[in-house]
């Protein structure tokens, strides 16, 4: 079965239930399905394998969890939402000029951190806030459970586990 953007014009309250029912049915009946989508929820939640294409060329192919956790490029990572690209030497002891990709949930507010950022804006998003900060003259996005006022200086923590995973 081939589905092209199958849920793009359906309201969220119907879409989520319909998605679960459809993909559960396909799995139960062992029906192969290819879904062309720009919606990461379709891919992450229900796919066995994700193929990412750019300008007609295959640029990535892996199971959802692997592709999400170790995206090979900013283009691929951005399929899953906002992504930050930061020089490794700015957030670790590394002297490498290599960049690393971090999702907003990979960066935490931590008052005791040596890394400081200035809050530019906070956006409410389904129970959390997407916080836009300026760090080392660069815009970064992070998630936080509370609103933070603009122009406030905050400490930010970069997950060493994620840095290690994505810097290899």
Q: How should these model regions be labeled?
A:
Residues 1-72:
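ABC ATPase nucleotide-binding domains
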Residues 65, 89-91, 120:
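Conserved positions in beta-strands of structured domains
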Residues 93-168:
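Non-catalytic connector elements of ABC transporters
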Residues 40-41, 73-74, 85, 148-149:
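Alpha-helix N-cap/helix-start and coil->helix boundary motif
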Residues 10, 67-70, 78-79, 110, ...:
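Residues that scaffold the ATP/ADP-binding catalytic core of kinase and kinase-like folds
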Residues 69-91, 99-101:
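C-terminal boundary and immediately downstream tail of ABC-type ATPase nucleotide-binding domains
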Residues 34, 85-87, 115:
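Structural detector for hydrophobic anchor residues on beta-strands
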């Amino acid at each position: 079965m081939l589905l092209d953007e199958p849920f793009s014009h359906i309201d969220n309250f119907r879409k989520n239930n319909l998605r679960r029912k459809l993909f559960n049915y396909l799995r139960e009946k062992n029906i192969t399905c290819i879904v062309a989508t720009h919606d990461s929820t379709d891919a992450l939640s229900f796919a066995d394998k994700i193929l990412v294409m750019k300008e007609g060329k295959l640029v990535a192919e892996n199971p959802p969890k692997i592709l999400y956790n170790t995206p090979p490029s900013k283009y691929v990572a951005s399929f899953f939402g906002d992504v930050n690209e930061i020089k490794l030497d700015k957030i670790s002891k590394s002297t490498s000029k290599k960049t690393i990709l971090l999702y907003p949930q990979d960066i935490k507010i931590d008052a005791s951190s040596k890394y400081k950022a200035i809050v530019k804006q906070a956006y409410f998003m389904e129970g959390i806030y997407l916080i836009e900060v300026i760090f080392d003259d660069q815009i970064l996005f992070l998630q936080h459970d509370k609103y933070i006022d603009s122009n406030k200086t905050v400490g930010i923590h970069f997950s060493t586990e994620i840095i290690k995973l994505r810097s290899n």
